[in-house]
Amino acid sequence: MRGKFITLEGIDGAGKTTHLRWLEYFLKERGKNVMVTREPGGTPLGEALRDILLDSRQTMHAETEALLMFAARREHLDKVILPALSRGEWVISDRFTDASFAYQGGGRGLSLQKLNELECWVQGEFQPDVTLYLDVSIASGRQRTSNIRQADRFEKEQDEFFRRVREAYLERAKEFPERIRVIDANQSLEDVRRSVEKSIATIYA
């Protein structure tokens, strides 16, 4: 039996890592074989591209950024995600294609047509079974990440960039309401966990 593919999305500080690890535990407790991965990354090539993409010393054209993201994603699908799903494993990914529409589309201003073409080329009709978008205010996200580590190339962007990213995520959620579940990540930890559990209830039965 094919496994399930769950993705978590949100700006930095939304709590993706925290809730991803809880979700991994939650599913394992219910007898699921779970693989956790991330984007960009997940493969040796993907991790090398991640280092380039996040390096705050790097500058690149927005289209270059998008192409590198989708190149990493193609490898990720081929080497990690699709084989795991075919083995019946449940795959949880910290970000996937919705992030490209939010960051490169909303944030960088790339046309949705170009991103749609890349999406179709790289993954065809393949989509996550469910996407959890953790929606947090930009101020809260900044506050949560301010003292964690040195900011990467994306985290150094101005608030206006993240406003566009957040708006793009919300527009994407309106476009695909059956797949993308918007969760208020400004809530308490327990309330967010309850929302996550409710959002995946239809696929883990």
UniProtKB/Swiss-Prot annotation:
Protein name: Thymidylate kinase
Family in the record: Belongs to the thymidylate kinase family.
Record bears the keyword Kinase: yes
Keyword field: ATP-binding, Kinase, Nucleotide biosynthesis, Nucleotide-binding, Transferase
HAMAP family: Thymidylate_kinase (MF_00165)
One Gene Ontology term from the biological process aspect of the record: dTDP biosynthetic process
Molecular functions per Gene Ontology: ATP binding; dTMP kinase activity
Upper taxonomic lineage: Bacteria, Pseudomonadati, Pseudomonadota, Betaproteobacteria, Nitrosomonadales
